[in-house]
Amino acid sequence: MRVHTGDLHGNMSRIIEFIQKNQGKENCYLFVHGDAGINYDLGEGDRKKKQELQKAVEEFWQKNQKECNILLIRGNHECRPENIYSYEKQMRWGGQVYVESEYPNLIFLKDGELFKIEGSQYLVLGGGYSSDYFSRMLNNEGWWPDEELSKIEWQKIIGRLEEKNQKDLDLLNLIVLSHVLPKSCAKVFTERKQTSRTEEKMDEILERFGSSIKAWYAGHYHINEERNMSENWKGEVKIFYDCFWKE
């Protein structure tokens, strides 16, 4: 079972309640589309939230004898896991992930990696731009200068996809998992005129590999909405906030 939800911003009650109510007839892969809020204060607050989540998934196992993994896409209001000493890199589902030994079921999917889970193929493109970064800096709120993927990181991601495409390596029916949407898709859901490198590079991904991408799932916008796009790219866009959507 693959389930998607949106930003948590440190409030774990919604996701814990979902895990507790789930009957657990099959393994659960629970995707959080950014800003989970567990790598935010980088201290005791984060630790308590991680303990709550890990406890919930362990109780899920004890009750159902089925596994529950919380798969996290990086947002723009959280520290990169690779910059936190307690995370180690592992290979899962065909791609690289970041995991802490204390919380083995809280798994950050590395940006730019391809994953195959229960027959579906995913491309992960995390991060985003904080339009409120100046006020966040002034008020000593969480802001990270590497919230967006760098130009070099984007070049590497696009290069890897080009290589796979040229070699015909099963780059079909991709579902992109992200925090924000490409510029061409975001304008349908928001009136914000300011754009970012992330949104523009995502548009480049669509232009180059749109024929391989069947759907794009995101968070960030604090709405639950879906739409079939048809203008420049024909595919399905879903935005998650406080819902739980099962694939």
Where are these regions (language model features)?
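Extreme N-terminal starter segment of soluble prokaryotic enzymes
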Residues: M1-V3
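Core catalytic region of metal-dependent phosphoesterases/phosphodiesterases
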Residues: T5, G10-I117, T190-D203, R208-F209, ...
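Catalytic metal-binding/acid-base residues of hydrolase active sites
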Residues: L8-H9, A36-G37, N76-R80, G128-Y129, ...
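Generic hydrophobic alpha-helical membrane-span motif
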Residues: S13, D41, P81, L125, ...
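Conserved acidic residues
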Residues: C28-L30, N173-L174, K214
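Conserved beta-strand segments of alpha/beta enzyme cores
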Residues: N69, N105-I107, Q121, A215, ...
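Active-site-proximal loop/helix segment associated with metal-binding centers of metalloenzymes
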Residues: G95-Y98, I117-S196
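Binuclear metal-dependent phosphoesterase catalytic core
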Residues: K116-E118, E204-S211, H222-E247
